[in-house]
Amino acid sequence: MPKLKTKSAVKKRFKFTATGKVIASQAGKKHFMRRRTKAQIRNLRGTTILCPQDGYNIKKYFLPYGIN
């Protein structure tokens, strides 16, 4: 049986820490930035760690060998 492919969308959007947590970039930066304060824009920079349930769902449903 051939190897399963990883979903390309997940490969591009998420990274994983050594302990298995899922890292994603902050959402809400594409448009409507004029109505946000400078502090809100500043806080949206960088990445965030997803909550455990979201990370579990990413690994279980979108990665072929994510959850053993």
From Swiss-Prot:
InterPro entries per UniProt: Ribosomal_bL35 (IPR001706), Ribosomal_bL35-like (IPR021137), Ribosomal_bL35_CS (IPR018265), Ribosomal_bL35_sf (IPR037229)
Molecular function via GO: structural constituent of ribosome
UniProt keyword NAD present: no
PROSITE patterns, sorted: RIBOSOMAL_L35
GO biological process: translation
Keyword Cell wall biogenesis/degradation: no
Alphabetically ordered keywords of this record: Ribonucleoprotein, Ribosomal protein
Domain of life assignment: Bacteria
Gene Ontology, cellular component aspect: cytosolic large ribosomal subunit
UniProt xrefs under NCBIfam families: rpmI_bact
Family: Belongs to the bacterial ribosomal protein bL35 family.
Protein name: Large ribosomal subunit protein bL35
UniProt source species: Rickettsia typhi (strain ATCC VR-144 / Wilmington)
